[in-house]
């Protein structure tokens, strides 16, 4: 069985521009320095069956929130743009929702976006 969270994470880590950025799932590591940028991948629910045939699920639908945090606003936006292009290349597109804000408590800018996508037919997710 494949795991879409791992697929997304691996795709992001392969990119030369993102390979030195901390990429984690669910939450930003507390041990990361305040000024370091990070990417956090959060599933917004379990995979949903979408294509069915012969009483079987043939494809799954996934929804993820990708949070990019950085000390500089434009750095966070540039990282999020690279994330967007990589996700498009694997069949995910931006959906409604998200956040663009500066948090005084952490002194970081956050650009959080929601992405949706489907597995290919017959892939085992």
Which stretches of residues belong to each language-model region?
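Amphipathic alpha-helical segments
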Residues: 5-16, 80-92
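Mid-chain, well-packed structural core segment of small domains
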Residues: 65-84
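Small/polar-rich, solvent-exposed N-terminal microdomains that initiate assembly or binding
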Residues: 1-52
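Short, solvent-exposed beta-strand/turn "edge" segments of beta-rich domains on protein surfaces
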Residues: 53-57
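Acidic-leaning, charged glycine-interspersed low-complexity segments
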Residues: 81-125
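Oligomerization/assembly interface segments of phage tail-like spikes and tubes
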Residues: 58-71, 108-120
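Short, cysteine-centered beta-strand-loop-beta hairpins and adjacent loop/turn segments enriched
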Residues: 48, 75, 122-124
């Amino acid at each position: 069985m494949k795991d879409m969270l791992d697929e997304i994470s691996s795709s992001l880590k392969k990119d030369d521009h993102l390979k030195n950025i901390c990429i984690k799932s669910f939450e930003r590591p507390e041990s990361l320095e305040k000024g370091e940028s990070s990417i956090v991948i959060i599933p917004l629910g379990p995979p949903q069956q979408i294509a069915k045939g012969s009483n079987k699920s043939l494809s799954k639908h996934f929804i993820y929130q990708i949070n990019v945090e950085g000390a500089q606003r434009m750095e966070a936006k540039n990282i999020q743009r690279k994330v967007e292009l990589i996700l498009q290349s694997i069949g995910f597109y931006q959906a409604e929702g998200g956040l663009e804000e500066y948090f005084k408590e952490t002194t970081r800018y956050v650009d959080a976006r929601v992405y949706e996508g489907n597995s290919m037919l017959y892939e085992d997710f």
